[in-house]
């Protein structure tokens, strides 16, 4: 294995060059390509080329929603930390993660549910346009699906890339439908 020595300021650029080479001319819709490349850059996982799915016009809708001053709700503080605060400020958006909130922990314990589910319940009270970014908790996606079916919420956008849970592995995998 050869180690390529790169100046710190060139690491990201070189990473994207390598990704582009690995794509080997593969077609990715132009609006989705920067996102796919960013996911691969962040994870070093080229399987996302085959596993990342976008709903029709999802990127265009996301841009439109962000321009309206959306609230992005994440299921981890790490995801919250990774969202560009300067971009949020320019767009008059904000990002929230309720997972560590005392009231969420209390609600989860009282209801016998996960903090992820209780966090979704808390986020359901937000009145602004909302984007859910779920990258860790399958129960957050399950709760979102329940609240959508009950017509309690109608999120503008859901980004769901949760870890696979052995508990939920037997449940059929299907996308959450938002019309």
Which residues make up each language-model segment?
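Charged, compositionally biased N-terminal leader segments and the immediate start
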Residues: 1-30
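N-terminal glycine-rich anion-binding loops that anchor highly charged ligand groups
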Residues: 27-41
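Short, basic, glycine/proline-bearing loop/turn elements
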Residues: 42-50, 105-107
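A short, well-structured juxtamembrane/interface segment
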Residues: 50-65
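Short hydrophobic beta-strand that contains or immediately precedes a catalytic carboxylate
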Residues: 72-74
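Conserved mixed alpha/beta catalytic, RNA-binding, or beta-rich assembly cores of soluble enzyme
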Residues: 76-147, 155-156, 162-164
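Single conserved hydrophobic/aromatic residue that forms the stacking wall/gate
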Residues: 167-179
């Amino acid at each position: 294995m050869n180690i390529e020595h790169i100046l710190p300021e060139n690491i990201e650029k070189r990473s994207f060059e390598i990704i582009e080479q690995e794509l080997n001319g593969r077609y990715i819709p132009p609006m989705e390509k920067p996102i796919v490349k960013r996911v691969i850059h962040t994870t070093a996982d080229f399987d996302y080329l085959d596993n990342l799915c976008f709903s029709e016009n999802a990127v265009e809708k996301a841009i439109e929603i962000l321009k309206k001053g959306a609230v992005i709700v994440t299921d981890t503080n790490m995801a919250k930390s990774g969202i560009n605060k300067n971009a949020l400020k320019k767009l008059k958006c904000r990002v929230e993660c309720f997972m560590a909130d005392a009231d969420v922990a209390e609600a989860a314990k009282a209801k016998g549910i996960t903090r992820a589910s209780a966090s979704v319940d808390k986020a359901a009270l937000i009145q602004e346009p909302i984007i859910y970014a779920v990258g860790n908790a399958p129960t957050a996606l399950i709760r979102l699906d329940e609240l959508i079916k009950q017509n309690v919420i109608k999120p503008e956008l859901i980004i769901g890339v949760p870890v696979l849970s052995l508990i939920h592995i037997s449940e059929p995998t299907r996308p959450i439908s938002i019309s």
